[in-house]
């Protein structure tokens, strides 16, 4: 296991966990509703490339449509809407704490990635069963 595999897994986990029993999930930025496998991504509130601290924390990854995640976070209103959603979900103090800790370095080792991957894969299987995919 490596960082890339864990990033892919946590992004899937974020989408499937938020999905209803039919597999549909809502974009936290624009509100569009789609199947978690159809045009939806696990978007990072704090970009994964700028924070080793938050990159693999589930509180930082939530469902976003492709448009909001790829384009809207850089040049559109998606980032502002994501911030409002985060404050509503976790509270303003937690979001401020996230921003303060975003530059804190975290060193992960292969065993850390293996443990995360194993734990998240089990949760994904649970949710696949919940929505009737297994």
Language-model segments: which ranges?
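Short flanking/linker segments adjacent to small metal-binding domains or redox-active Cys/His motifs
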Residues: 97-134
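Active-site metal-coordination segments of metallo-dependent hydrolases
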Residues: 4, 51-55, 73-75
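Short microdomains enriched in Cys/His and/or Lys/Arg
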Residues: 48-61, 87-100
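Histidine-centered nuclease catalytic patch
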Residues: 26-60
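Short Cys/His-centered divalent metal-binding micro-motifs
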Residues: 32-35, 60-91
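Short, charged surface segments at domain edges that flank catalytic/cofactor-binding sites
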Residues: 1-26
């Amino acid at each position: 296991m490596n960082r890339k595999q864990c990033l892919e897994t946590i992004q899937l986990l974020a989408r499937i966990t938020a999905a209803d029993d039919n597999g549909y999930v809502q974009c936290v930025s624009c509100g569009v509703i789609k199947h978690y496998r159809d045009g939806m991504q696990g978007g990072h509130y704090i970009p994964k490339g700028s924070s080793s601290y938050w990159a693999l924390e589930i509180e930082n990854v939530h469902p976003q449509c492709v448009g909001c995640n790829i384009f809207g976070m850089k040049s559109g209103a998606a980032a502002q809407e994501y911030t409002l959603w985060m404050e509503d979900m976790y509270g303003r103090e937690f979001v401020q704490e996230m921003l303060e800790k975003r530059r804190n370095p975290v060193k992960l080792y292969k065993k850390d990635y293996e443990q995360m991957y194993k734990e998240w894969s089990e949760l994904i299987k649970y949710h696949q069963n919940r929505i009737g995919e297994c």
